[in-house]
Amino acid sequence: MSVSIKPLEDRIVVKTLEAEQTTASGLVIPDTAKEKPQEGEVLAIGPGRVDDNGNRVPVDVAVGDVVIYSKYGGTEVKYAGQEYLILSARDVLAVVQK
């Protein structure tokens, strides 16, 4: 999926993955009981931040990676009818290995 949002510096555009609809035992989770998702697919990355010496520090994730991010990290944006999350690289906690 290509997105026409180009993040600046060390920011990352993420499409949030939907939270589980049922528990492992098959119980349906109502919308009011669902927690905010913390997992998403990276759709775009910025060029990286500039350090104190003027060198560009690249972001540690790549487009297509599935990442786990801070629960309250990022800014939710709606663009072209889709909802995205724009995170700082510091808000990314891990890359999911499949």
Curated annotation (Swiss-Prot):
SUPFAM superfamilies, sorted:
GroES-like (SSF50129)
Any coiled-coil regions, as ranges: none
Annotated Gene Ontology MF terms? Answer: ATP binding; metal ion binding; protein folding chaperone; protein-folding chaperone binding; unfolded protein binding
A GO BP term here is: chaperone cofactor-dependent protein refolding
Q: This protein's superkingdom?
A: Bacteria
Keyword annotations for this protein, in alphabetical order, are: Chaperone, Cytoplasm
Among Pfam families, the record links this protein to: Cpn10
Q: Which InterPro entries match?
A: Chaperonin_GroES, Chaperonin_GroES_sf, Chaprnonin_Cpn10_CS, GroES-like_sf
**Tell me, what does this protein do in biology?**
Together with the chaperonin GroEL, plays an essential role in assisting protein folding. The GroEL-GroES system forms a nano-cage that allows encapsulation of the non-native substrate proteins and provides a physical environment optimized to promote and accelerate protein folding. GroES binds to the apical surface of the GroEL ring, thereby capping the opening of the GroEL channel.
Q: What is this protein called?
A: Co-chaperonin GroES
